[in-house]
Amino acid sequence: MGQGESTPLSLTLDHWKDVKTRAHNLSVEIRKGKWQTFCSSEWPTFEVGWPPEGTFNPSIISAVKRIVFQETGGHPDQVPYIIVWQDLSNSPPPWVPPLAKIAVASGQDNGRKSAGGRPSAPSRLPIYPETDSLFLLSEPPPYPTSPPPPPAPHAARPAPGLMAEGLGSEGPAAGTRSRRPRSPTGDTGPDSTVALPLRAVGPPAEPNGLVPLQYWPFSSADLYNWKSNHPSFSENPTGLTGLLESLMFSHQPTWDDCQQLLQVLFTTEERERILLEARKNVLGVNGAPTQLENLINEAFPLNRPQWDHNTAEGRERLLVYRRTLVAGLKGAARRPTNLAKVREVLQGPTEPPSVFLERLMEAYRRYTPFDPSSEGQKAAVAMSFIGQSAPDIKKKLQRLEGLQDHSLQDLIKEAEKVYHKRETEEEKQEREKKETEERERRRDRRQEKNLTKILAAVVSEKGFRGRQAGNLSNRAMRAPREGRPPLDKDQCAYCKERGHWARECPRKKNARETNVLTLGD
């Protein structure tokens, strides 16, 4: 889409690689699904002006950050995400245009609200139209005592007049409850930045009474965003479990909303497993899971109950139902014990030890019924962490003295030391280059040595052939002599007789004897 229709959230999702790099530079880990969930669903409920499509407004980001960092009632799991948002606002990357060109809350809220707090008419069509072919679901009927629902349910197409005016600003939140025109209740209408099925519509009727709630059903855009941005429950149950756990706390869904979420986000087999696990987790009078059918049906009914959300009893029953449903989600997420799957989780060549430990603990949660963070399982997790780490880290950890006394945090510190001391890619290339040069030098030396031997052999053979050429005339004489039998120790080489050697042979002396002239001669 064009730059004029971009939102802060869509920009960050389109450039997610840059956002991940910035988070890595800040030494934090973020995930795409949670990034979108917190921006579009969680932070708008803080009532500080955060729009579901996100914003780079520093004041709004600081307000959200103060709530996230609260000592009591804070949200530690959201700390990395708001830190990255603030860093993007303080040091915007090149792909972030000026604030005036983005649909941020600071520029839109002033245009939405007129005197008296009423929102002005939006100007753009929603990105996700209200489709009735995506989810063939009927709108849950309103409770008897609640005010009538808005005239445009999520299963019906918008009227032509509304289509001409537009149903909301651009961004993934367009067309959701939070971006729809509010009901004609004047100043008593709910805040447009809060997307809750049950929302306060005015002060209590009595001084100590309950605040009346108005029912706003989920829209198809909400369901479409949640379904498309999270993996299936069978593939990775953590994503949808975290989403529904967050929705139960922030959106306060009714029984009908819970059934709609189960119908859209889960398959038939997954729904049956979740409901079965939830009914196993219904608490009895003593606070322990009960097996009494009447208590189970009362706390977690399978058929639509007549609970009034504007009474204390109805709200309490809805609260118990939501808690039980979350317990069922967590129970259904556990699979039969399969330690082979846990052993398949190995540390990657460039994977940080902390990220590897998180994957390992997630495998324990998915493929075993154990809680890896419990005291009884820390030893098993530690041994798996050591045995399945990278070879250099594994070698270092196995050499630690008193290994049984080290905690997981200690092992992580030691693994981080080895990880950060690894040679960089440039150092690795330089080392490989030096090793290649050294191998080539050794090969050249071997070749030179072999060549020297060959030359020496050639020279010696030439000398031998020269000696042979000089003695060609004696070849006939040498041939018989070479064939003579060897002499004995006391045998003469000249006369072949025994008892003397050739230099003492009398025959040889006689042959060489010459006449000596005397004075008389």
Curated annotation (Swiss-Prot):
Q: Which PANTHER family match?
A: GAG_P30 DOMAIN-CONTAINING PROTEIN
Which positions does the site annotation Cleavage cover?
Answer: 128-129, 196-197, 455-456
This protein is called Gag polyprotein
SUPFAM superfamilies (alphabetical): Retroviral matrix proteins (SSF47836), Retrovirus capsid protein, N-terminal core domain (SSF47943), Retrovirus zinc finger-like domains (SSF57756)
Per the record, the gene is gag
Q: Where is this region: Disordered?
A: 107-126, 136-195, 420-447, 467-490
Basic and acidic residues bias: where? Answer: 479-490
Q: What else is known?
A: Koala retrovirus is both a circulating virus and an endogenous retrovirus of koala, except in some isolated populations in south Australia.
Q: Where are the zinc fingers (CCHC-type)?
A: 490-507
Motif mapping: PTAP/PSAP motif = 119-122
- Kindly state the positions of the motif PPXY motif in this protein: 140-143
Q: GO BP, one example?
A: viral budding via host ESCRT complex
Q: Which UniProt keywords apply?
A: Capsid protein, Host cell membrane, Host cytoplasm, Host endosome, Host membrane, Host-virus interaction, Lipoprotein, Membrane, Metal-binding, Myristate, Phosphoprotein, RNA-binding, Viral budding, Viral budding via the host ESCRT complexes, Viral matrix protein, Viral nucleoprotein, Viral release from host cell, Virion, Zinc, Zinc-finger
Residue ranges under compositional bias (Pro residues)?
A: 139-153
Spell out the GO cellular component terms annotated for this protein, sorted alphabetically and separated by semicolons.
Answer: host cell late endosome membrane; host cell plasma membrane; host multivesicular body; membrane; viral nucleocapsid
Attached lipid, kind N-myristoyl glycine, located at: 2
Report the source organism.
Koala retrovirus
Picking any one GO molecular function of the record gives: zinc ion binding
